[in-house]
């Protein structure tokens, strides 16, 4: 499995939903409202996403998602 596929398959569908909204520059409270989740739950998802992808910030997650989108066409 390539590194890109390995990274992509690490995330659950819900984590991907959070990533897409982070990429749209949404705040955690906005993401929580949009997905019908609690604020702390969204923060937990964001932390898990950063750990799984070995990233250190919300901005890094957005940049990673943008790169993935471009590479997938």
Residue ranges and their predicted role:
Residues 1, 44, 70-71:
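Generic low-polarity alpha-helical segments
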Residues 2-40:
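Helix-turn-helix DNA-binding segment
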Residues 16-20, 50, 62:
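Hydrophobic residues on short alpha-helical segments
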Residues 5, 51-73:
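Basic, Lys/Arg-enriched C-terminal extension of HTH/homeodomain DNA-binding domains
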Residues 27-60:
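Recognition helix of helix-turn-helix DNA-binding domains
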């Amino acid at each position: 499995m390539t590194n890109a596929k390995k990274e992509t398959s690490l995330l659950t569908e819900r984590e991907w939903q959070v990533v897409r909204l982070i990429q749209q520059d949404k705040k955690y409270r906005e993401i929580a409202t949009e997905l019908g989740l609690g604020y702390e739950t969204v923060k937990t998802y964001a932390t898990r996403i950063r750990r799984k992808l070995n990233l250190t910030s919300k901005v890094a997650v957005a940049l990673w998602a943008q790169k993935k989108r471009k590479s997938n066409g």
